[in-house]
């Protein structure tokens, strides 16, 4: 096992525009880090740089305290699992898992032992003689992971490995990946555009946008204290409500562009008069009453999800989503009186988009 360090790493295709801005990341020995972000944010490019498949423009990459920036991929001590399984169709499961070790010149006995152990871990024991065409999608992905495991790498690199699986199988494979990491404790860097994968698998999440690491933290930290408007809007389903307005002159209320005033939990006097964006998650808005000082919202539509419901409405031109209990099913056009939990409000600078 080994740690991984990226030190002010950048990437430019033309020598002018940086698609990866200077990025530093320390991954502890045995840690599971997930890079998440929209398509084109640079997460797969960064993973390929760690793998040695893309050249680093500036900066350094270290694995197990060894600088590997210019080192060939085969010499870095990494194993990669891709979105496409990349299995040899004419080989059996056993042969696919053993092939990489065979071309490296490892002895037959040692290869057999490693394949047997990986097959046991991944519950592939009874499938070793089958061809890929005889396997399900989940089984093929386990074979791809087994091929990586037998190499006993310093670092696992996962490039959206579950993207080709259906929704039910993705849930199963997420659980299997969690169990696999708990057992192997190998340093892992995982790329996905799926925030559910990121939040369920990661010990720490790196949220990327436009080649920049917007925030690095535990799933709880990223969810509860988003560092920027982008993180607030990207993490969470449904997304955080983001309302534009200004802090009043006394710093006690947030005045929405539509004229509604929302109470603030003190400490915002230094932002008095400034344009800001206020964020609150749908589950932190609760039903209240006019007598209790609730803020009215005329409901447009209701999404019935089973375990709970989502009420959609507007304050002026600004959309608001409220998560309601299963038994709460107001009709369209009805007025909801709402209370926003003041200790769950998030304020973001109107110019920079950064959390204040």
UniProtKB/Swiss-Prot annotation:
Query: Per the UniProt record, which EC number(s) apply here?
Result: 7.6.2.10
Membrane topology of this protein: Peripheral membrane protein
Q: Which SUPFAM superfamilies match?
A: MOP-like, P-loop containing nucleoside triphosphate hydrolases
- The residues listed in the UniProt record as binding ATP, with positions renumbered to this chain, are 37-44
Task: Provide the reaction this enzyme catalyses.
Answer: sn-glycerol 3-phosphate(out) + ATP + H2O = sn-glycerol 3-phosphate(in) + ADP + phosphate + H(+)
Matching entries from SMART domains are given as:
AAA (SM00382)
Could you give a single Gene Ontology term from the biological process aspect?
carbohydrate transport
Q: Which GO terms describe its molecular function?
A: ABC-type glycerol-3-phosphate transporter activity; ATP binding; ATP hydrolysis activity
Which is a Gene Ontology cellular component entry for this protein? ATP-binding cassette (ABC) transporter complex, substrate-binding subunit-containing
Q: Where located?
A: Cell inner membrane
- Pfam families on file: ABC_tran, OB_MalK
Q: Which stretches make up the ABC transporter domain?
A: 4-235
> NCBIfam families in the record, alphabetically?
PRK11650.1 (NF008653)
Subunit annotation: The complex is composed of two ATP-binding proteins (UgpC), two transmembrane proteins (UgpA and UgpE) and a solute-binding protein (UgpB).
Task: Give the record's family classification.
Answer: Belongs to the ABC transporter superfamily. sn-glycerol-3-phosphate importer (TC 3.A.1.1.3) family.
Protein name as it appears in the record: sn-glycerol-3-phosphate import ATP-binding protein UgpC
Species source reads Shigella boydii serotype 4 (strain Sb227)
């Amino acid at each position: 096992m080994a740690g991984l360090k990226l030190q002010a790493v950048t990437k430019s295709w033309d020598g002018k525009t940086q698609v990866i801005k200077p990025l530093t990341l320390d991954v502890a020995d045995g840690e599971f880090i997930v890079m998440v972000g929209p398509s084109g944010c640079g997460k797969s490019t960064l993973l390929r740089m760690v793998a040695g498949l893309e050249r680093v423009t500036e900066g350094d990459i270290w694995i197990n305290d060894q600088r590997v920036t210019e080192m060939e991929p085969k010499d870095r001590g990494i194993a990669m699992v891709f979105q496409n399984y990349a299995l040899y169709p004419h080989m059996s499961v056993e042969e696919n898992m053993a092939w990489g070790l065979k071309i490296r010149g490892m002895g037959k006995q040692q290869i057999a032992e490693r394949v047997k152990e990986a097959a046991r871990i991944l519950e592939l024991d009874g499938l070793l003689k089958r061809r890929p065409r005889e396997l399900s999608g989940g089984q093929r992905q386990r074979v791809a992971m087994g091929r990586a495991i037998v190499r006993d790498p310093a670092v696992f690199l996962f490039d959206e490995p579950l993207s080709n699986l259906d929704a039910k199988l993705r849930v199963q494979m997420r659980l299997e990946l969690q169990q696999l990491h708990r057992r192997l404790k190998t340093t892992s860097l995982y790329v996905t555009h799926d925030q559910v994968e990121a939040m369920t698998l990661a010990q720490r999440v790196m949220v990327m946008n436009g080649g920049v690491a917007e925030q690095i933290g535990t799933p709880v930290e990223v969810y509860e204290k988003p560092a920027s408007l982008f993180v607030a809007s990207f993490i969470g389903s449904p997304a955080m409500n983001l309302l534009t307005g200004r802090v009043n002159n006394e710093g006690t209320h947030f005045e929405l562009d539509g004229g509604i005033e929302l109470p603030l939990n003190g400490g915002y006097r230094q932002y008095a008069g400034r344009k800001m964006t206020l964020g609150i998650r749908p589950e932190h808005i609760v039903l209240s009453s006019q007598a209790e000082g609730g803020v009215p919202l005329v409901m447009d539509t209701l999404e019935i999800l089973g375990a709970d419901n989502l009420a959609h409405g507007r304050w002026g031109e600004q959309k608001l989503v409220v998560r309601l209990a299963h038994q709460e099913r107001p009709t369209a056009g009805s007025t909801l009186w709402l209370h926003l939990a003041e200790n769950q409000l998030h304020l973001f600078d109107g110019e920079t988009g950064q959390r204040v």
